Design a protein with these regions (language model features):
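Transmembrane alpha-helices and adjacent helix-loop boundaries
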Residues: 1-231
């Protein structure tokens, strides 16, 4: 059976009604997860660099476990296997209990934090120890030294890598389609179902993901060059 690639159904009305809401959610999920994931990942990185062995072990198990499990499996696990009462306890008062959008934010934050933590750990270790000792010499505590001296430099040094991981995160958001969240891919597939074009939508969907990801990659590359010049 020949494939009839008729894209005429992708009118401005279809884009406005189906694709833009999905794109908005995918970008929203990416940004929220990036912010929460970097914060949680930084805490995990500090745990791995802690002088307390038990903190190191907890952080190591967290990172190694999540990096060894496929993301789709984690998404399904958090959405299907975590008891509904857990979500009700956290967000029942806000009407968010067991919604795929809420589950996706929790899942991606926990999962991506494992990757962001390794990036931040490398960034922290890239800061010369002499600056830490200089902070101690002027009377700073460990937390002050980390907050005012080490972490700002680590974040700046690793910003291109953090943003590159965020691009991967944006691509991974297409997996939330599996739990019914209305993301960018879901918007394309919905339009394909409405206009009986289930096959044709895959090509423009892939093209849109490519254009967005490639454009962001070029911006990250330019940022990387600017950071190198500042150094």
């Amino acid at each position: 059976m020949a494939l009839n690639l008729d894209m005429s159904f992708l009118t401005s009305d279809v884009v406005k009604a189906n694709l833009l809401p999905g794109l908005y959610y995918s970008l929203q999920l990416t940004v929220v997860t990036m912010v929460c994931g970097v914060i949680l990942g930084t805490l995990i990185a500090l745990m791995r660099l802690s002088s307390k062995p038990w903190l190191q072990r907890i952080a190591a198990v967290y990172v190694d476990t999540l990096r060894s499990i496929p993301l789709l499996m984690v998404i399904l696990w958090f959405y299907l296997l975590i008891p509904a009462g857990f979500y009700s306890f956290i967000a029942g008062g806000y009407g968010l209990a067991h919604r795929p959008e809420f589950s996706a934010v929790i899942t991606f934050t926990i999962f991506e934090a494992a990757y962001y933590s390794e990036i931040m750990r490398a960034g922290i270790q890239s800061v010369p120890r002499g600056q830490v000792y200089a902070g101690y010499a002027v009377g700073m505590t460990y937390s002050q030294c980390m907050r005012l001296v080490v972490l700002p430099q680590a974040f700046r040094n690793m910003l291109p890598v953090l943003l590159t991981q965020t691009i991967v995160l944006f691509q991974d958001t297409s997996l939330v389609y599996a739990i019914g969240a209305y993301d960018f891919l879901k918007g394309f597939l919905t339009a394909g179902q409405i206009y009986n074009r289930p096959d044709e939508v895959l090509l423009p969907a892939a093209a849109c993901y490519f254009v967005i990801s490639f454009s962001l990659s070029m911006l990250v590359r330019r940022l990387q060059k600017k950071i190198a010049i500042i150094r």
